[in-house]
Swiss-Prot record:
GO cellular component: cytoplasm
The organism's taxonomic lineage, starting at the top: Bacteria, Pseudomonadati, Pseudomonadota, Gammaproteobacteria, Enterobacterales
Name of this protein: 2,3-diketo-L-gulonate reductase
Catalytic activity: 3-dehydro-L-gulonate + NAD(+) = 2,3-dioxo-L-gulonate + NADH + H(+); 3-dehydro-L-gulonate + NADP(+) = 2,3-dioxo-L-gulonate + NADPH + H(+)
Source organism of this protein record: Shigella boydii serotype 4 (strain Sb227)
Keyword NAD: yes
Length: 332
């Protein structure tokens, strides 16, 4: 079914206010959920909202909490999110990283006691729109087996890198072949995954999203490489924030909350002039996209460039929402 941006935001806003979230906070949070969905990231927008409400009701998310700065070391700061609303706090932390970068050339904010930030790409994009390189990542509860194991002991720990090219070039990727949100999107659409995304119950690689959602044997991106990246990203976020690791979140908490996140902004213009920057980026993009195609009907894409098109389509035609997901939203 199709809904408008206004319908989405109103539904989110109503659910938040009915649970005691103050009107200003509810409006800002609903806006971010609606913008994420409008951008085409349904898995971490409308599809994720019922789970967000569940954590709000369980007390994992403290809606009136505000992040607090703990340590300041010039270009590096350490903050405590105090289990505040994840997407609003992440936006504030990237804004702070940008402010630090404006003074120092680079800014790094390490955040502890955070909640799920929903679409991580929003914060990389936020930096790139202002002309900065944006880098951020988060740890999570253990939802992926390390390479060679059956049992979940590492996080999907998504990493975002956004470049201020025209259009913005951005990688937003979990350390698994697919996020659990994308498994859900494909299952709801009745689609197999385009490539193997995990193991079935017999230990064979499978493209069936529902099987992987159930047994949680999701495949690390690049096999052992994604497994290793997940571990080191967790270590860095834990150390710099003095926060909880994947092991601590999984073993000590009843759900995924109190996680650790990193936000980095780099002011490119302190290192290279604008025309030179633009020319170098354009040459990279042209060199990649003019490679001989393996399939003449399949264009060579650059990461993140599809979001501008998706946003325009959703604004023109309405936002596609799965019927069952919309029913859940309406029932909240």
């Amino acid at each position: 079914m199709k809904v408008t941006f206004e319908q989405l935001k109103a539904a989110f806003n109503r659910a938040l206010i009915s649970r005691g979230v103050d009107s200003e906070t509810a409006d800002a949070c609903a806006e971010m959920f609606a913008r994420t969905t409008e951008s085409g990231v349904y898995s971490h927008g409308v599809n994720r909202f019922p789970r967000f409400i569940q954590q709000l009701e369980n007390g994992d998310i403290i809606p009136d909490a505000q992040p607090k700065r703990i340590t300041s070391l010039g270009a590096i700061e350490q903050w405590d999110a105090q289990r505040s609303i994840g997407n609003l706090t992440a936006k504030k932390m990237m804004d702070r990283a940008i402010e630090l970068a404006a003074d120092h050339g680079i800014g790094l904010v390490a955040l502890r006691n955070a909640n799920h930030w929903m679409r991580g790409g929003s914060y990389g994009w936020q930096a790139a729109e202002k002309g900065y390189i944006g880098i951020c990542w988060t740890n999570s509860i253990a939802v992926m087996p390390p390479w060679g194991a059956k049992e979940c002991r590492i996080g999907t720990n998504p990493l975002i890198v956004a470049i201020p090219s025209t259009p913005i070039t951005m990688v937003d990727m979990s350390m698994s072949m697919f996020s659990y949100g994308m498994l859900e999107v494909n299952r709801l659409a009745g689609r197999q995954l385009p490539v193997d995304g995990g193991f079935d119950d017999e230990g064979n690689l499978t493209k069936e999203p529902g099987v992987i959602e159930k047994n949680r044997r999701i495949l690390p991106m690049g096999y052992w490489k994604g497994s290793g990246m997940s571990i080191v990203l967790d270590m860095i976020a834990t150390l710099l924030s003095d926060g909880a690791s994947v092991a601590e979140v999984t073993q000590d908490n009843s759900d995924e909350y109190g996680i650790s996140q990193i936000f980095i902004a780099i002011e490119v213009d302190k290192l290279i002039d604008g025309p030179t920057r633009d020319a170098k980026l354009q040459r990279i993009m042209d060199y990649v996209t003019t490679a001989e195609r393996a399939d003449e009907n399949q264009a060579i894409r650059l990461p993140g460039h599809e979001f501008t098109t998706l946003l325009a389509e959703n604004r023109r035609n309405g936002i596609t929402v799965d019927d069952s997901v919309w029913a859940k939203i309406q029932a909240l």
